């Protein structure tokens, strides 16, 4: 598991990382397909476009971090086009697991957070999404018990 540089950089004083999550290997299938098509069609412009798309996909995958601290849900996707998630735990209304047939077969899914005043945010293509959802719900329950 790689170090979560972005998540560490968002920590407040005395804030602790509880869990970090990695992307499922399935995200690399798109990269491989883009590379294959790009290399096969390289003599023409479309090949270059596919190779550039593959590079952008690699940078996006490498730039993705997801985690939960004792105070918030935090995440970052992308490298060039970046999207940050910073959602206070006390603002989360629901945690939804979105997993299609391929996700169930291969063990990946999307975790969607509905927050007050923030709309929907989520972790896409996470490994073992049921475990992720259960861990997040447990943290939310622990916070409710402390109130």
Protein language model annotation of sequence segments:
Residues 1-147:
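N-terminal basic, Ser/Thr-rich segments that initiate or prime the first beta/alpha elements at protein or domain
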